[in-house]
């Protein structure tokens, strides 16, 4: 199996043929997928490091995933930032850093709400030739239901449930869910 994406070669050929728009669209699609995959790989490496109780290493992977997303302005598309925030929250709880965990919980819930509320931003120049539609974005109600389920059922969040901040964030999620029904 080749260690490169054949679409990159096709894009180069399209460019040489003078089909610039087609080449640009294909190159942007490849870039988007590579960035997304790199972010997901960093998150996976962070999960492994977290399971091995190598929390500093996990945070470095998660920070790199966020930096990648920030660099390419991909967060408007719902990329990995919420996954990173969720993982950081879990690690902070395991480390007994309750105040930092509650702060991360706020960040996590606001990230989900931004996605669900569909806050529009300008399309990043890296992806301005790509078309976005409902099939390329996750179902909004499902995201909130999933987050609420995780917060209410995962053992790692148990010690946060008695906190006011936790209850406020759960209420925000529930209110947004009611609006979406």
Question: Where are the predicted features?
Answer:
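Alpha-helical protein-protein interaction modules
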Residues: 35, 39-181
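Solenoidal tandem-repeat scaffolds enriched in leucines and small polar residues
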Residues: 1-42
